[in-house]
Amino acid sequence: MPHLAELVAQAKAAIEEAQDVAALDSVRVEYLGKKGHLTLQMSTLRDLPAEERPAAGAVINQAKQEVQQALNARKEQMESALLNERLAAEKIDVSLPGRRIENGGLHPVTRTIERIETFFGELGFSVESGPEIEDDYHNFDALNIPAHHPARADHDTFWFDAKRLLRTQTSGVQIRTMQNKQPPIRIIAPGRVYRNDYDQTHTPMFHQVEGLIVDKDISFTNLKGTLHDFLKNFFEEDMEIRFRPSYFPFTEPSAEVDVMGKNGKWLEVLGCGMVHPNVLRNVGIDPEVYSGFAFGMGMERLTMLRYGVTDLRSFFENDLRFLKQFK
């Protein structure tokens, strides 16, 4: 079958000339499809004597297999070339500097709150919370702050109406806790508070943590020891500390706590005192049986002292150049 050999040669030549998979598939259809040149050779078998047909059929099948193998080889070659091209295009230049991943960090005030919660948690204090929109009873009356007290003035407090306000302290959390729990009580109450003030050391919203212990035989000595240990832990040094007599309506006696700054001047850091008997009576606790101490501190102020920040407003301006210093 000399004509068969020519067809195989033509098919192989067409396969080599094919430049892509689509052209290669066209060659396959032309020679091996249902009406392909090699497939049609099978129809010539009927013109041969019966005894020659098997041998002739075998020759045609061998020719078809030879062309199919050439197709497979050429297709594999094309796919390999395409893969190499893609890999070359996707190759990573290891000499290029890597892209630095910017890790986030906690806000410095959040760091301070977590540090305080950790310290007092190790002393057995639980963390309590309460509403930021408060009523005048929990924010003032129950804390022994009478109606004529300056803290109730419009210029200091954000009032919604005659009874509702944005809390000026987290002390209301202490009142609610004492109303719902029986002594012994040992809590801290971190949260946002609001006062109508704005300057280098004050903002209308700031963070405060207040602490409370109510139990039998609680003394001012317990208060001093607790706060001394806290300040030593927070500032990570054995700082000189003084308790200065002060006045708060909800504690008696009351004191403000100062620490000695690096400039040799005293710096106020918090207020504290023994829970006033009237406050205990307001929540149904007998002051003849139980006593307690309370303290309160501004988170931004402590953070300023710890990190040497001079303007409290920097904590709320969201300047990444400032915040990245505290990662």
Curated annotation (Swiss-Prot):
Gene3D superfamilies: Bira Bifunctional Protein, Domain 2 (3.30.930.10)
Protein name according to UniProt: Phenylalanine--tRNA ligase alpha subunit
Entry EC no(s): 6.1.1.20
Quaternary data: Tetramer of two alpha and two beta subunits.
Gene expressing this chain: pheS
Catalytic activity: tRNA(Phe) + L-phenylalanine + ATP = L-phenylalanyl-tRNA(Phe) + AMP + diphosphate + H(+)
Keywords attached to this entry: Aminoacyl-tRNA synthetase, ATP-binding, Cytoplasm, Ligase, Magnesium, Metal-binding, Nucleotide-binding, Protein biosynthesis
The organism of origin for this protein: Proteus mirabilis (strain HI4320)
Chief subcellular location: cytoplasm
